Amino acid sequence: MPSPLPVSFLLFLTLVGGRPQKSLLVEVEEGGNVVLPCLPDSSPVSSEKLAWYRGNQSTPFLELSPGSPGLGLHVGSLGILLVIVNVSDHMGGFYLCQKRPPFKDIWQPAWTVNVEDSGEMFRWNASDVRDLDCDLRNRSSGSHRSTSGSQLYVWAKDHPKVWGTKPVCAPRGSSLNQSLINQDLTVAPGSTLWLSCGVPPVPVAKGSISWTHVHPRRPNVSLLSLSLGGEHPVREMWVWGSLLLLPQATALDEGTYYCLRGNLTIERHVKVIARSAVWLWLLRTGGWIVPVVTLVYVIFCMVSLVAFLYCQRAFILRRKRKRMTDPARRFFKVTPPSGNGTQNQYGNVLSLPTSTSGQAHAQRWAAGLGSVPGSYGNPRIQVQDTGAQSHETGLEEEGEAYEEPDSEEGSEFYENDSNLGQDQVSQDGSGYENPEDEPMGPEEEDSFSNAESYENADEELAQPVGRMMDFLSPHGSAWDPSREASSLGSQSYEDMRGILYAAPQLHSIQSGPSHEEDADSYENMDKSDDLEPAWEGEGHMGTWGTT
């Protein structure tokens, strides 16, 4: 019976050596990858056996015996796959696997690996060697590639056998199905190999699987041994050395994991952050692309609409500002075709006078001023006979037109020669003018027949004097007669803006087409040297005269 002291010491060493040394919290979102390192990054690579436990389980769910570096295992839908990265020349040979259960201590052939340009070839069956004979017929056919000096090895029952060193012709390439059936693989240096224990897919079951590498000229090498157990069902995982990776984590993977390697135990706490089922489904199926693309499209449309409305508003404001600041758009001239008398919203507007018509008007004005000096103050002028009317109409084709203020040709009166047989009423505040009328008799002259004209170039302008106000005088600011006399009997638009008042409408009781009614010819009412107009009760009602 052993003494109790050594037993207690051994138990103490076991507890001290097996207690957790480090604890690490690993947080991952649902659907992410859980990475659990068993050793720190600075630890050297060890060939010691490691085991992974979960929770309070007494049986490890994964046991791994590392072999050569650069090897890994993948547990998934195709079975348990041995992963070899960066294949080199010395990795060619026979790869055997062992499953327990059902097989125990029985190694079954898995795959032969042939590395190109390595000088070695491996085959499971001797019948496949005939296709590798490189005679003249096979060389000329072009279906094979000569590998002169390659060493050929064939598996004979439970051991490899040297077939010979004669030249062989390796096939240019074989289909994947043929390679899977024959289990002979030819790879290029630096590629990655995925080897299964049997033809994939191989169902994954709890148990153990081991791999070994056999080469006729080198000793056998144990690669990896993996044992699956535990209470939880087997799930997809990656084992790479001392690193355990659980892809697409779920809430079932949350818990505490222990890694036992030699006398060192590493504890890992895994916390899975839950996500909504819809978001998880979108991530797994790739359906998140649909709402993201829709949202991007809506944002693009909204930005485009806002930009379009902003540009449209800026364009409208710019066009309005340009129109308001353009001096050419401040005044409008209506110039319809000459002589047609087209009616529009401005009334009976004819074409504007040309330079020739302006000169004709000036000549007629000069003749009228020389023959009848007092015709400006007569508001009623008899209409001449039909012959004179037609003659006057032929001379003045422009007819009625709006006057042009600031014109170099002088201001023109408001004329209407198209309807000489009717009474004419002036609406622009200036007197009528008919330069071609003959002098009227004394019986047809009214009280304004001997009144002075607006302007006389040979006389000096009368000084403004005070005037008397009556009910016919314009109210507001004082009226300057010299300003009235500065024109040829017509007020410009600028003067009319300063003198806005309603002219008295005086109607005559006498009937007849030879009398004209006008209320605009009261120019001499405000002369300082004349007397106030007096109303006359006899004769014509609504007229006045000077005494």
From Swiss-Prot:
Disulfide bonds join 38-259, 97-197, 134-169. Residues 17-18 form a propeptide. SMART domains: IG. The chain crosses the membrane at residues 288-311. GO terms for cellular component: external side of plasma membrane; membrane raft; plasma membrane; protein-containing complex. Phosphorylated on tyrosine following B-cell activation. Phosphorylated on tyrosine residues by LYN. Tyrosine residues are phosphorylated sequentially after activation of the B cell receptor. Phosphorylation of Tyr-522 is extremely rapid, followed by phosphorylation at Tyr-402. In contrast, phosphorylation of Tyr-493 appears more slowly and is more transient, returning rapidly to basal levels. Glycans are attached at residues 56, 86, 125, 138, 177, 220, 263. Residues 312-547 are cytoplasmic. Disruption phenotype: Mutant mice are born at the expected Mendelian ratio, thrive and are fertile. Mutant mice display normal differentiation and expansion of pro-B cells, pre-B cells, immature B cells and resting mature B cells in bone marrow. Number and surface phenotype of conventional B cells in spleen, Peyer's patch and lymph nodes appear normal. In contrast, the numbers of B-1 cells are decreased to 10-20% of the normal values in the peritoneal cavity, together with a severe reduction of serum IgM levels. Likewise, mutant mice display severely reduced serum IgG1 and IgE levels. The modification Phosphotyrosine is found at residues 346, 376, 402, 432, 493, 522. InterPro entries: CD19 (IPR042341), Ig-like_dom (IPR007110), Ig-like_dom_sf (IPR036179), Ig-like_fold (IPR013783), Ig_sub (IPR003599). It comes from the Eukaryota. Residues 395-415, 434-447 have a biased composition (Acidic residues). Keywords: Adaptive immunity, Cell membrane, Disulfide bond, Glycoprotein, Immunity, Immunoglobulin domain, Membrane, Phosphoprotein, Repeat, Signal, Transmembrane, Transmembrane helix. Functions as a coreceptor for the B-cell antigen receptor complex (BCR) on B-lymphocytes. Decreases the threshold for activation of downstream signaling pathways and for triggering B-cell responses to antigens. Activates signaling pathways that lead to the activation of phosphatidylinositol 3-kinase and the mobilization of intracellular Ca(2+) stores. Is not required for early steps during B cell differentiation in the blood marrow. Required for normal differentiation of B-1 cells. Required for normal B cell differentiation and proliferation in response to antigen challenges. Interacts with CR2/CD21. Part of a complex composed of CD19, CR2/CD21, CD81 and IFITM1/CD225 in the membrane of mature B-cells. Interacts directly with CD81 (via the second extracellular domain); this interaction is initiated early during biosynthesis in the ER/pre-Golgi compartments and is essential for trafficking and compartmentalization of CD19 receptor on the cell surface of when phosphorylated on Tyr-346 and/or Tyr-376. Interacts with PLCG2 when phosphorylated on Tyr-402. Interacts with LYN. This is B-lymphocyte antigen CD19. It comes from Mus musculus.
